[in-house]
């Protein structure tokens, strides 16, 4: 039965696979080996970042503050990306009459329903299991007053935040509906990563393997509080997205000029800023000792450069609505 569940998941029948796994576990509750396989199966489709994101107290406070400020009695809230259900419960706690939250992963949706019931919000929070583009207005129960999401990745765009917001604003939201976060920005700065070259290949057993370095990804995730990273310029916004717009945001390119503070630069570091509303900002700017559930992304240069204080250096980028490419312009 568990083997069949795996085959069904591989075939994209996620809800049926989950139900079959649950049935197998229920039929043999004393089977320790089956229980172990069941735990592996249930967790196999759940990204580990779910266990990190809810521990970000600054992120939690930013969302909670914005929700409390926005929600008025009687409002309906739509959330895209349930996860643990924490933001949906925050919305209900802030006074929303109804919260509908979309979760495309059946195992996560099931866990979220259990969490929401356990915390006493089952009468006001409803989990829709499916991608938000499968939701209908009838299932939502009418247009919503507030849209809240956290489907942003380290580069902001990787979880299809743009198409999800555009469809929601067109099909599900009332005119003038508030969106939390209202805007998302891609921020960049010149930087030095003191460990950038650690994994580069050189001579191994007398053989020069350095040409293989051309195949190494130039993008590396770095925790924002890691001491290996030093900013070598003031930050700037490479892209700024209005999440409340129903207009399609086309693929685009952008450039800005960074004023170097001086010193060795071997890459460009990118992070995100979320303007929850006009008063509340969440930003995971790299700095010693800071923490964030999102990492910065270090874009290594082909070769390091030495900069002088005040030197102007061009940084450019492009996005295709889903992914992001960043580079230093020719000097």
Report residues per predicted region.
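Class I SAM-binding transferase module
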Residues: 2, 9-11, 22-26, 31, ...
């Amino acid at each position: 039965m568990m083997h069949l569940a795996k085959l069904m998941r591989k075939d994209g029948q996620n809800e049926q696979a989950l139900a079959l796994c649950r049935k197998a576990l229920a039929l043999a509750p004393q089977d320790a080996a089956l229980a172990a396989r069941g735990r592996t199966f249930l967790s196999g489709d759940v990204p580990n970042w779910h266990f990190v994101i809810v521990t970000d107290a600054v992120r939690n406070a930013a969302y909670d503050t914005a929700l409390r400020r926005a929600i008025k009695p009687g409002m309906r809230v739509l959330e895209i990306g349930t996860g643990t259900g924490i933001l949906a419960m925050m919305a209900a706690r802030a006074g929303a009459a109804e919260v509908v939250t979309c979760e495309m992963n059946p195992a996560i949706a099931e866990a979220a329903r259990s969490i929401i019931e356990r915390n006493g919000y089952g009468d006001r929070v409803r989990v829709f299991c499916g991608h938000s583009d499968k939701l209908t207005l009838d299932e939502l129960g009418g247009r919503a007053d507030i849209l809240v999401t956290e489907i942003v990745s380290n580069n902001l765009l990787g979880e299809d935040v743009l198409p999800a917001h555009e469809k929601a604003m067109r099909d599900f939201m009332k005119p003038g509906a508030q969106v939390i976060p209202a805007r998302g920005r891609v921020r960049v700065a010149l930087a030095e990563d003191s460990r950038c070259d650690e994994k580069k290949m050189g001579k191994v057993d007398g053989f020069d393997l350095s040409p293989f370095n051309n195949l190494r990804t130039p993008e590396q995730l770095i925790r924002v509080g890691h001491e290996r990273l030093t900013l070598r310029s003031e930050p700037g916004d490479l892209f700024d997205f209005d999440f409340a717009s129903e207009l399609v945001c086309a693929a685009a390119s952008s450039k800005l000029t960074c004023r170097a503070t001086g010193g060795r630069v071997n890459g460009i570091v990118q992070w995100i800023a979320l303007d929850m509303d006009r008063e509340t900002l969440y930003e995971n700017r790299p700095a010693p000792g800071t923490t964030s559930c999102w990492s910065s992304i270090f874009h290594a240069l082909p070769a390091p450069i030495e900069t002088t204080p005040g030197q102007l250096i061009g940084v450019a980028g492009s996005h295709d609505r889903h992914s992001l490419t960043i580079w230093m312009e020719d000097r």
